[in-house]
Amino acid sequence: MERSLLPEPPLAMALLGPRFEAQTGGNRSVLDNVLPDMAPLVNPYWSRFAPMDPTMSKILGLFTLVILIISCCGNGVVVYIFGGTKSLRTPANLLVLNLAFSDFCMMASQSPVMIINFYYETWVLGPLWCDIYAACGSLFGCVSIWSMCMIAFDRYNVIVKGINGTPMTIKTSIMKIAFIWMMAVFWTIMPLIGWSSYVPEGNLTACSIDYMTRQWNPRSYLITYSLFVYYTPLFMICYSYWFIIATVAAHEKAMRDQAKKMNVKSLRSSEDCDKSAENKLAKVALTTISLWFMAWTPYLIICYFGLFKIDGLTPLTTIWGATFAKTSAVYNPIVYGISHPKYRLVLKEKCPMCVCGSTDEPKPDAPPSDTETTSEAESKA
């Protein structure tokens, strides 16, 4: 597709009439480049803004390409290692595998489309691909957050409940994954059948749910969607980690107090080494989840700006929010690759050049010496 296929500036005036010149003062608008088949989907609000600087489009395109490569390579390796290694296919790791697969699909379905549109400085793939792009973003984003929610619950069950908890089996893990995907599909298809819709946003290089239309239909969807796909998982994750942190802190305090009474520095047995390993995994999961919310919260705020008619929403703001949200798919393979000893061992066997640092496993059958501190034991886990 050549740039000559892009529409001429009068299209924006034809679409909005006198209001175009009133809002732009005769200057160019982001609607100047919009294709005719996309024009009916564009909210008139965006007509007041000038096109984004071509240099910024190139920067965004390059940034998107970089995170695409990092994410697809990282998540692809995680899927390969966890999926192809029998010893790593535990119930808990199936949730990690599901998360990595979702993140991989997120970037594979979103980033190439964004890069194409950054090149043309508008959406050039038509209404159908607008729906597909936005639906994929919604689907895989929902799967990712609920996968993290289930990971948090698994850590809660292991660390807080301990022997009183019900161990997660392969069957239970598969049922949880099936639930995650069914719920994600439900929220994804709603805008396709009439509850809200998928439309171009900001500088018209990406599509998302309609958060600008002042009608109850799209507003009710956004409120309900954010309740079930953002706030509910956030509450459940915070609940899980509140008790995880409290349990770990109480355990460590009891260990220190008892060690003082016995005039030693550590009381860790082989069982406690396993406990420390579980605590380490909980810290990894908490870090991953925190990074995910740091990536997606700005975009939620952008949607709420449109929902509640708050001034200050610009095309550049929306596209940076949408682009930054994609970085959530980059964090997980990095965090797990650095912090999961068994993952690192298998990765070293299959791809030695991909591993940096030591891959020594903890030795739970030999308890730490009396001179070994609690923090040292935890670092080995």
Curated annotation (Swiss-Prot):
Q: Where is the composition biased (Polar residues)?
A: 370-381
Q: Which GO terms describe its biological process?
A: phototransduction; visual perception
Which Gene Ontology cellular-component terms appear in the entry? membrane
Q: Which InterPro entries match?
A: GPCR_opsins (IPR050125), GPCR_Rhodpsn (IPR000276), GPCR_Rhodpsn_7TM (IPR017452), Opsin (IPR001760), Opsin_RH1/RH2 (IPR001735), Retinal_BS (IPR027430)
Annotated S-S bridges: 130-207
Show the stretches that span the lipid bilayer.
Answer: 57-81, 94-119, 134-153, 173-196, 221-248, 284-307, 315-339
Where is it mainly found? Answer: membrane
Q: Does the keyword Disulfide bond apply?
A: yes
* Positions of glycan attachment: 27
- What keywords are annotated for this sequence in UniProt? Chromophore, Disulfide bond, G-protein coupled receptor, Glycoprotein, Membrane, Phosphoprotein, Photoreceptor protein, Receptor, Retinal protein, Sensory transduction, Transducer, Transmembrane, Transmembrane helix, Vision
Q: Which residues lie on this side of the membrane: Cytoplasmic?
A: 82-93, 154-172, 249-283, 340-381
Q: Tell me, in a sentence or two, what this protein's role is.
A: Visual pigments are the light-absorbing molecules that mediate vision. They consist of an apoprotein, opsin, covalently linked to cis-retinal.
Family assignment from sequence similarity: Belongs to the G-protein coupled receptor 1 family. Opsin subfamily.
Q: What else is known?
A: Opsin Rh2 is the predominant opsin expressed in the dorsal ocelli.
Can you name this protein? Opsin Rh2
